Amino acid sequence: MLNISTNMMINQTLNFDSNQESQKNKTERISKTKLTRELITKTDHDIYVDDISFLQREDNVNVSQIDLTARGVLNPEDQGVLHKSTEFGVFNKNKTGLPASVDLKIKQNSFFSVKQPDFNKYLISDFVEIQRNSFFTLLEKGIIEEFSKRNPITNSKKTMEIFFYPDYYQLTPPEYSPSQAIIKSKSYTSKLYIPVQLTDKSKNIIKLKWVYIGDIPLMTKRGHFILNGCARVIVNQMVRSPGIYYQKKIYENFSNKWSEKPENTFTRYFADLICNRGTWLRIEMDKYNKIWAQMKRVPKIPIMWFLIAVGLTDKIVLKTVMDSKILLYNLDEDPLNPRKKPLPYVKTPPAAWSAIYNIVFAKKIKAQEKAKKMLELTEGNPSSKSQTKNKTSASKKSKTLNVANTKGKTPAENIKTLSELIDLEKALFLKSEQGRKWIFNKFMNPRTYDLGKVGRVNFNRKLKLSISQDITTLTPQDLLAATNNLILVSKGLRELDDIDHLKNRRVRTSGELIQIQIGVGLVRLEKTIREKMTYASGLSSLPSQKFAFRSSKQRNQSPVGDAENATQLTIGNLINTKPFNGALREFFGTSPLSQFMDQINPLAELTHKRRLSSMGPGGVTRDSATLAIRGIHPSHYGRICPVETPEGKNTGLVNSLTAYARVNAAGYIETPFYRVYKGQVQKKTGLYFFSAKQEEKIKLGAPDLYTSEIGFLPKASIPVRIVEDFTKISRNEIQYVGVAPIQMISIATSLIPFFEHDDANRALMGSNMQRQAVPILKPQRPIVGTGLEARAVSDSGHVITAKSSGIVMYTSSKEIIIYSLQ
């Protein structure tokens, strides 16, 4: 007892001495620094604290060595500090003003030592980061990319040229702030100005001018847009990633509708070539092993014709493709239909172009043949005034106005019919050039077909090619390798693709959706500019036969303006803001992905901005969506919440991002993991984010595995997941472990206390009904919470936030008073 009491007295003496020294250091530091009082009130714009390097309070402790990078979310009820860290997450407040959830130990030197494992439980990024980052990418790269694709715009004779310089574009400050736009029912937009150069080669004139293109809606700091006084959110869209995917479909034939077992079955293998913009192409092998190229609203084309039409020769095709006899099956005679003529064998691209044109435009050719017969009948009918033995050409007879004067019709009534028949007669001569243009515009024109860099990477990886990422159209090598792989898939030498796997699906964020719509507006703008330049150069003169019978008002009206304005062509006359503004107005006003923001409570707003929709343009519909699309896939772990989804027709089609998930630059969803090195969880090295494709190559442990004080896993065998299989391995074989148990669920679901004991159906209802709760007048802390409540409110932007670090002296719902060290 004597030894114990002596030791206690010694420790108290040491603590007293150290406290005296720390107090002296504190007074010296305060005397050298100047305390300034800063008042922060609630303004129109949301204010965020960039960082709080340290917090100093009037206690006998020194916390200068603790780095708490925070955004200063403050509790209106107390005058202490509630920390929300962009790096370490949300903490509760204790009496000392320091995070209570952090295990802090006071040493004899009065310094705090932070226990690292508890800190790393809260490494959650900003919840609205997906919206802000996508819009930043639009301003940084998207606008420049879309204008660069339209350069240059020329007339038909190439004598006039419009060239944009998007790298130097400027945005003006918005006319209204977000709050003013809401009050006055205006839009929170900025005007876009771009330098434009007009070159007239015929007159050797070059003009350069800043031009107003249109209005760009701006995103607020809370991640939404304000149009006509209404807050709108652009929902993120989940679509199939551009690339090539091999699948099969099994067909069953039943003898009658009452039979239980199918009479026979057959399998069709096909490859879907998906692009960002343009026509989707399917290469399909039918039950007779015939391979066809298929497109929407176009008859199927033999694959041999298609490969030769894109520039390959028959020798290259037959030598490269495995079991090349399959390519010739659809050129053989059909034993089931012997009357049908076999398709011809082509060797050169011009022959293939003509053959494809005959198939694609078969209906048009039949109509032209009927017109030709009508012409022959018309030419054989003599005129009423004079009979001729020798037939003359229709163009020569049209001058006499006596050609088609049959059954009492006057010559003037038949002029219009005759001119149409003459036009059809000219179109009867099919040229291979027309087929070549059709193939080029469908798959090889960068203005009409675009794989994107993501699609090019997927093509190269799947087909083992090394084509440059700058080439975003289909190449002959792509189609040849795709056909060869389809044959290998049908023989079981290649694996099929799982289209529901997240490695084959990507997210179109709000910035990308706006960029696509900007491209639509620029296509319309390009069309109007080209029409104006063509008219100004005198190339829009109409044929005399069509122009002769127009009314005097129509003849006097000019499609662009009068002749004087056409001769004095300027950049301002060429560029109009209507196409650009109209395209954006259509998207924000009528698109199903642009929705009125849910503002019932902060959680509803936050969830709305993190929503993922599989519907919309280029997506699926409620009626066509199958259970496979709506279901939960193993790759959703840590990326898409398996609980939070609507009830009804939209079940599984509308989802939410998980709490830790983020979207990378390519549009794939990533989730974080800790690295494990020789059985030790390396939390200090930071987080490793993996997409669904990268996750297939690693061995993952559960996030709730027991670890020692220094981070070592148990020596016993540990359950892990490898791709979709579960097994047990030693701790030295584990590569990564999860970050936290809430990694697999969304923010709304993570607010449910004791979620693991809840029924799945009730948890789904609870996640959705939390968004319908009406906020109370006097907010209070939850009696039972999960620790993410303050973080959800702070990221939604509904609370006052401090803009600098310091000592909090007073907080309320209207103002924050801080003493800061400067």
Curated annotation (Swiss-Prot):
<dbReference type="Pfam" id="PF04563">
    <property type="entry name" value="RNA_pol_Rpb2_1"/>
</dbReference>
<keyword id="KW-0934">Plastid</keyword>
<keyword id="KW-0808">Transferase</keyword>
<dbReference type="GO" id="GO:0009507">
    <property type="term" value="C:chloroplast"/>
</dbReference>
<feature type="region of interest" description="Disordered">
    <location>
        <begin position="376"/>
        <end position="408"/>
    </location>
</feature>
<comment type="similarity">
    <text>Belongs to the RNA polymerase beta chain family.</text>
</comment>
<dbReference type="GO" id="GO:0005739">
    <property type="term" value="C:mitochondrion"/>
</dbReference>
<dbReference type="InterPro" id="IPR007645">
    <property type="entry name" value="RNA_pol_Rpb2_3"/>
</dbReference>
<protein>
    <recommendedName>
        <fullName>DNA-directed RNA polymerase subunit beta N-terminal section</fullName>
        <ecNumber>2.7.7.6</ecNumber>
    </recommendedName>
</protein>
<dbReference type="GO" id="GO:0003677">
    <property type="term" value="F:DNA binding"/>
</dbReference>
<dbReference type="GO" id="GO:0000428">
    <property type="term" value="C:DNA-directed RNA polymerase complex"/>
</dbReference>
<comment type="function">
    <text>DNA-dependent RNA polymerase catalyzes the transcription of DNA into RNA using the four ribonucleoside triphosphates as substrates.</text>
</comment>
<dbReference type="InterPro" id="IPR007642">
    <property type="entry name" value="RNA_pol_Rpb2_2"/>
</dbReference>
<keyword id="KW-0804">Transcription</keyword>
<feature type="compositionally biased region" description="Low complexity">
    <location>
        <begin position="383"/>
        <end position="393"/>
    </location>
</feature>
<dbReference type="GO" id="GO:0006351">
    <property type="term" value="P:DNA-templated transcription"/>
</dbReference>
<dbReference type="GO" id="GO:0032549">
    <property type="term" value="F:ribonucleoside binding"/>
</dbReference>
<dbReference type="GO" id="GO:0003899">
    <property type="term" value="F:DNA-directed RNA polymerase activity"/>
</dbReference>
<dbReference type="InterPro" id="IPR007644">
    <property type="entry name" value="RNA_pol_bsu_protrusion"/>
</dbReference>
<dbReference type="Pfam" id="PF04565">
    <property type="entry name" value="RNA_pol_Rpb2_3"/>
</dbReference>
<keyword id="KW-0548">Nucleotidyltransferase</keyword>
<dbReference type="Pfam" id="PF04561">
    <property type="entry name" value="RNA_pol_Rpb2_2"/>
</dbReference>
<keyword id="KW-0240">DNA-directed RNA polymerase</keyword>
<keyword id="KW-0150">Chloroplast</keyword>
<comment type="subunit">
    <text>In plastids the minimal PEP RNA polymerase catalytic core is composed of four subunits: alpha, beta, beta', and beta''. When a (nuclear-encoded) sigma factor is associated with the core the holoenzyme is formed, which can initiate transcription.</text>
</comment>
<dbReference type="InterPro" id="IPR015712">
    <property type="entry name" value="DNA-dir_RNA_pol_su2"/>
</dbReference>
